[in-house]
Structures are given as structure tokens and as C-alpha cells.
Amino acid sequence: MIALIQRVSEARVVVDGAVTGEISNGLLVLLGVERDDDVAKADKLAHRVAGYRVFSDADGKMNLNVQQVNGSILVVSQFTLAADTRKGMRASFAERNADPAVAEALYEHFIAQIAGKEIPVASGRFAADMQVSLVNDGPVTFWLQV
């Protein structure tokens, strides 16, 4: 399971012209579910995302997590993160992506785990054509994989 996390001052996702999720200060999480992922991996990744220290403390060091800065998390499904890009000029999705039904269940489970940590969470719509806008703060972007 892959999370591309970006520290943002604002982010939102629009589906069919309607905003489905929007946050101010916090993290935009693009979430990719791989073939062998399971609930245990989703739990571990949610724990890492929630606790990952990407916000500056009083000394300007990245020592604070999203909860410590009263931030929010916007989660957007992103199947292309699991693509095989090792060769050729086109990504392959057949080998590494999870079955869509499994991926959706793990995506929803991940969101529930974040919400269970009392972090405000918003989301896109699984497998929808979405327009995601953000203001990347820093920029600060990390690739987390479990």
C-alpha cells in the first residue's frame, strides 16, 4: 500500500462538478492499493500517515504530525501509484494493482482508521474521475509504502 503525502495549506477534490472533500492546513494523501495489500497494511499505513512528522515546530524543524497542528487529512484514491513503470513508454496496471473491490474496501478502511484517530478527514470518491487542487506547503512531499 502506497501513500503519497503532501503537506498542504489547502486542498479539495471535485467529482462531477461538486466538491466531495476539502481541507485547509493538513495533508493530502494520494492512496494506492497494491495486489497483496490487506487490512493489516492499511492499519499500519494509516498509523504512519497520522504520526508522520512533516510540520514545523517552534525551531523550524519538521517535528510535528498533523494532529499536533490541528490539521486535517484529505484522502484521494490513486490507482496509478501502483503502476509498473520499469520499462516502455506506458505504465502497466495489470500486475501490481489490487482488484477494484478489494482496493475500495481497503481505501474505506484506511479512511475509517484516520477518522478513528480523531483527525478530521475528507475524501474523494473511489474510482471516480476527480479534479484535485492543492496548495503544496513547502513543498513537502513524501512517499510512504508498507
Curated annotation (Swiss-Prot):
Major site of localization recorded for this protein: cytoplasm
Localization annotation: Cytoplasm
Keyword tRNA-binding applies: yes
GO CC terms in record: cytoplasm
HAMAP family: Deacylase_Dtd
Family: Belongs to the DTD family.
Functional note: An aminoacyl-tRNA editing enzyme that deacylates mischarged D-aminoacyl-tRNAs. Also deacylates mischarged glycyl-tRNA(Ala), protecting cells against glycine mischarging by AlaRS. Acts via tRNA-based rather than protein-based catalysis; rejects L-amino acids rather than detecting D-amino acids in the active site. By recycling D-aminoacyl-tRNA to D-amino acids and free tRNA molecules, this enzyme counteracts the toxicity associated with the formation of D-aminoacyl-tRNA entities in vivo and helps enforce protein L-homochirality.
Domain description: A Gly-cisPro motif from one monomer fits into the active site of the other monomer to allow specific chiral rejection of L-amino acids.
Protein name in UniProt: D-aminoacyl-tRNA deacylase
Species of the source: Tolumonas auensis (strain DSM 9187 / NBRC 110442 / TA 4)
Gene: dtd
